[in-house]
Amino acid sequence: MKKISRKEYVSMYGPTTGDKVRLGDTDLIAEVEHDYTIYGEELKFGGGKTLREGMSQSNNPSKEELDLIITNALIVDYTGIYKADIGIKDGKIAGIGKGGNKDMQDGVKNNLSVGPATEALAGEGLIVTAGGIDTHIHFISPQQIPTAFASGVTTMIGGGTGPADGTNATTITPGRRNLKWMLRAAEEYSMNLGFLAKGNTSNDASLADQIEAGAIGFKIHEDWGTTPSAINHALDVADKYDVQVAIHTDTLNEAGCVEDTMAAIAGRTMHTFHTEGAGGGHAPDIIKVAGEHNILPASTNPTIPFTVNTEAEHMDMLMVCHHLDKSIKEDVQFADSRIRPQTIAAEDTLHDMGIFSITSSDSQAMGRVGEVITRTWQTADKNKKEFGRLKEEKGDNDNFRIKRYLSKYTINPAIAHGISEYVGSVEVGKVADLVLWSPAFFGVKPNMIIKGGFIALSQMGDANASIPTPQPVYYREMFAHHGKAKYDANITFVSQAAYDKGIKEELGLERQVLPVKNCRNITKKDMQFNDTTAHIEVNPETYHVFVDGKEVTSKPANKVSLAQLFSIF
């Protein structure tokens, strides 16, 4: 058999087993763990290539015949970092491995059969990840949705009704009528969406009514009063309906301290938002809950990574987001109690230790909706530069750290909110919400986004040019955004109770409507690559953070990767 050099092979088919790829301008190095394509039998589309009838394309159409095949992709997922063909059929991932013509080629499985009905997308030299999931959305403006989508986020979970003061401060869509409006508004967008109801009440009937109206869970927020009673009742109803509860705890410790909140939670599962505390929560020690077995702890992106500008930036943001007044002494003291450089410094380290499990945005309410993915990778890179390789790494690569940080915005938020059966990873049977990246722009600017198996967004040149590539090249909506295609390509998540009662038909929804499930039978141990539990304490006078008796902190960065170099114009 004729052989070619590794350099020639990579240029034709992309990296193979043992090859290493740098992610953007970071120090993070991904190494290909396995190549499922077969040497000499690789798929390649184009003039004089192999994707043609009688070669890699079968002339015997079958029911397994793919709608789309992505060839020779480098998949970066919590399940592994590996090379494979990805087959898509009926909007889902039908197969991962060796695609082609099983009548002519070895190793081709039925679920990766290429036929006359199959479209081809060249994945050689590209990285494929699952679409990101942002679970901390203030639905203040609908313009957030395309902004997040262009960053690689394909699922948004949160609450709100637009720029009302309640929404500016809290991720809550309160009540049946508001949920109806938001569920109907969701029809317009290329984004999977789910809405959180108001959990700040001790009235079980009111809580239940919101879940039956289509909410996928509750948000309890201090601006509405995060009392032990509200926590207990929301969790009681959540347990009954199998939905998640997210919480922003009591910064002022009005109704109790962190110990009182944990007593009210009573060992039940809860998703804690901005668990470090700068975004809100028991001052100064909400961060200690991150080590508990029943807590699914999240960060929001304004505090990660910790930089020389973080502290100064937060004061003005906080005053606006929580309707505070700089002329009122108590409001200023409230803000000061939340912005603690010591706990922010510890946050980066806790992410690197796998104690913090999820990253999210806190969109337009101190966080940036288009930067969840970028800031997650900036944090990973900052921590590698400061602390070196993780002890869990095997070989001369950063694969473990890469899986740890990828999981924070893909599979872990999916598990937390009961949607991991559908989205959150590159696995057979899941919805084909996929993001394609050039390695040089990984984490900053996707090359293309596939939504429900159909191309929804892509970098595209002048529409009047003779080929697709002439400038100006920028993101443009593709056909999955338009007409009734957007209904097939996107999902509205609801509770099982609302699904069973026919919420789709009741509200006249045309999008896919799917129920969340398995929200209450999970713990920290279900958080992939981020399941570390520990005893965390905060010194009440200095705010220094200790994990199992050892102080943890990090230095503020004066320069980060994936930044201005990629945004010159």
From Swiss-Prot:
Active site: H322 (proton donor)
Record bears the keyword Transmembrane: no
Family annotation (Gene3D superfamilies): Metal-dependent hydrolases, Urease, subunit C, domain 1
Keyword Kinase: no
Pathway in which the depicted protein is active: Nitrogen metabolism; urea degradation; CO(2) and NH(3) from urea (urease route): step 1/1
Xref: HAMAP family: Urease_alpha
Protein name per the record: Urease subunit beta
Organism of provenance: Helicobacter pylori (strain G27)
Family under the similarity heading: Belongs to the metallo-dependent hydrolases superfamily. Urease alpha subunit family.
Chain positions with N6-carboxylysine modification: K219
Positions with a binding annotation for Ni(2+) 2: K219, H248, H274
Binding site for substrate: H221
Urease domain location: 131-569
The record's account of how the chain is modified after translation: Carboxylation allows a single lysine to coordinate two nickel ions.
Membrane-spanning segments: none
Biological process per Gene Ontology, one example term: urea catabolic process
Catalytic activity: urea + 2 H2O + H(+) = hydrogencarbonate + 2 NH4(+)
E.C. code: 3.5.1.5
